[in-house]
Regions:
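Metallo-beta-lactamase
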Residues: 2-23, 101-111
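Pre-active-site segment of Zn-dependent metallo-hydrolases
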Residues: 13-19, 36-79, 86-91, 101
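Residue-level marker for the onset of beta-strands and adjacent loop->beta junctions
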Residues: 23, 31-33
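Short active-site oxyanion
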Residues: 24-26, 94-99
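Short loop/turn positions at the edges of beta-strands in beta-sheet-rich folds
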Residues: 29-31, 40
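Active-site-adjacent beta-strand anchor residues
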Residues: 30, 99-102
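A generic "binding-loop/recognition-motif" signal
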Residues: 33, 80, 105
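Phosphate- and divalent-cation-binding pockets in alpha/beta enzyme and binding domains
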Residues: 83, 91, 107-111
Length: 111
């Protein structure tokens, strides 16, 4: 029996334009478990792992930290390495209005 590694399609790269005000709501896949939700210019990053991943990735991140002009909030669901990156949290802090996470994950962000 042959075993194969399933691989998701490569995410579509995007940059600062994805954060602009718009008429509706757009959800963009960040690769892995993450997403960017832009609802009429309110931008929420969910489980962004844009850097600091501790193993090779099967797909490249479609967004770089330096291309995030602002985020109204970052939601961190839990601390598994495909949902949480200290490096990403640290580097997005200057452009992020608020972080929301369970108490344990919030403590990791402060470390």
């Amino acid at each position: 029996m042959n075993k194969i590694q399933a691989k998701a399609p490569d995410p579509i790269p995007f940059g600062k334009e994805a954060f602009s005000p718009q008429a509706g709501t757009t959800v963009r896949w960040l690769g892995g478990a993450g997403a960017l939700v832009n609802c009429r210019g309110t931008n929420i990053l969910i489980d962004p792992v844009l850097e600091g991943f501790d193993m090779p990735l099967l797909v490249e991140s479609p967004l770089q930290v330096e291309d995030v002009p602002q985020a109204d909030a970052i939601l961190l669901t839990h601390s598994d390495n495909d949902h949480f990156s200290r490096d990403t949290c640290r580097d997005l802090a200057p452009v992020c209005g608020a972080y929301h996470a369970p108490r344990y994950v919030a403590g990791l962000c402060r470390d």
